[in-house]
Amino acid sequence: MANTRLQSEIEQQIYKDFPINLTAHPVTGNLKVLSNADAIKQSVKNVVLTNFYERPYNPEFGSDVLNALFENMTPLTEYTITQNIRTSLRNFEPRAIIEDIKTQANEDQNALNVTIRFSVRTLPEPIEVNVLLERVR
């Protein structure tokens, strides 16, 4: 019985977060709140786009993939970026169970389009997040 109750609590778990830009709700004027899939998508993007040493009290947070964009874009570089993303999400976003990470190089714009497909235990369908990694000077 306790196992069934625990399972139902896990299935009903709701994740909430504030959007990065802290925009107000157009009708109520309150801060918008992201929930469930949207909250986890934002968290995944935050982890991927954060470089090491950007967080003062947690210097190992992030994936540090933006530094790899200054390397020559070869299949080995794409593989390294994919593995860095997979490792950082495994360490810093335990709610996301990574199913697939695909990269597509865009040499003309010096960018890399990353598609991350993951699932969440409490949500029935998989979620996809697209992140465009660009070189910033």
Where do the model's predicted regions map?
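Immediate N-terminus of the mature polypeptide
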Residues: 1-82, 87, 99, 104-137
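Short secondary-structure junctions
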Residues: 90-98
